[in-house]
Amino acid sequence: MPRAAAPPVQPAVPPKPIVTTTVIITHPACLQHEMGPDHPECPDRLTAIHDQLIASGLDPHLARREAPPATPEQLARVHDRRYVAAIQAAAPSSGLRYLDPDTALNPHSVDAALHAAGAVVHAVDLVCGGLYQTAFCAVRPPGHHACRARAMGFCIFNNVAVAARHALEAHGLERVAVI
């Protein structure tokens, strides 16, 4: 007597589709900030992130959002208003203008810095609003060394502090951990 075909094996728990829980926030202006041909803080940093997301297979599983520029009010939570105005006025029409030995502006740098700071504010809003569990800001110039009234260490605005202050003041959080 012929054997009946075995029924297909069903997994105990059906696999769940990958749900987009992470958003990447960036802006094309961040690729325009350049501090010279041999400077380590360069557009290739963002290109490398993009390339690795594709190579790893993660890219299709991530949401993408374009960063808005930070507002003067958002920056003023962390930076002296005179400093913000001075940075905006310091952008050269061509070439580079150095703010410190490590940090320079080109004609596109202020726009890039405003969008980098705006990205972190947008990330806080998206995560605190429950739209995503996590956010990654692929932006430059970086923003963790800048002081209240001074650029430093490749950083024009302190994006990390801008994000933390925004979380505290706009979303009513009591504490923020910066890791």
Task: Describe every region a protein language model picked out.
Residues 2-4, 11-179:
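HDAC/HDAC-like amidohydrolase catalytic core signature
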